Amino acid sequence: MNVTAIYPGTFDPITLGHADLVGRASRIFDRVILAVAESKAKTPLFDFGERLALAREAVAEMPNVEVVGFNSLLVDCARTHGATVILRGLRAVSDFEFEFQMAGMNRSLGPEIETIFLTPGESYAFLSSSVIREIAKFGGDVSAFVPGHVRAALMRKFAGSG
């Protein structure tokens, strides 16, 4: 059985926690789609193209991982790419309620697609893209939390601000 999982998010920016989860998923599933949401509801720091490029570079060494962009219902994106599993990370109990609601809605819209939760590695349980952006905005060192190319992109974004 060939199983494809889809891992959606805005990835603004992608962190080592995201990359760790994708790497672990790539050992479980035959194929992993990292799906970058265009997300017009949010005001991202990095535009859609930048987020796609940063994500692609972050997973470049993972041969069974592919990065795609989407601006549709997640279940429609999953179907388009042949994914039968939605992969979500749970950092804390506080994430559970929202993720539980989303899993129920996705199951309602796409009953053939299962949602599976992975917990982060201990080193990454506290990471979030919004916290990373805030640290970088004020000149803090984010090198332990994001890939080097993401750190450089953050530094360029915030050059002269903060």
Swiss-Prot record:
ATP binds at residues 10-11, 18, 89-91, 99, 124-130. Gene3D superfamilies: HUPs. It catalyses: (R)-4'-phosphopantetheine + ATP + H(+) = 3'-dephospho-CoA + diphosphate. Keywords: ATP-binding, Coenzyme A biosynthesis, Cytoplasm, Magnesium, Nucleotide-binding, Nucleotidyltransferase, Transferase. GO terms for biological process: coenzyme A biosynthetic process. The keyword Nucleotidyltransferase applies. Its main location: cytoplasm. It is an enzyme of class 2 (transferase). Pfam families: CTP_transf_like. It is found in: Cytoplasm. Pathway: Cofactor biosynthesis; coenzyme A biosynthesis; CoA from (R)-pantothenate: step 4/5. Belongs to the bacterial CoaD family. Homohexamer. Reversibly transfers an adenylyl group from ATP to 4'-phosphopantetheine, yielding dephospho-CoA (dPCoA) and pyrophosphate. This is Phosphopantetheine adenylyltransferase. It comes from Methylococcus capsulatus (strain ATCC 33009 / NCIMB 11132 / Bath). The lineage of its organism: Bacteria, Pseudomonadati, Pseudomonadota, Gammaproteobacteria, Methylococcales.
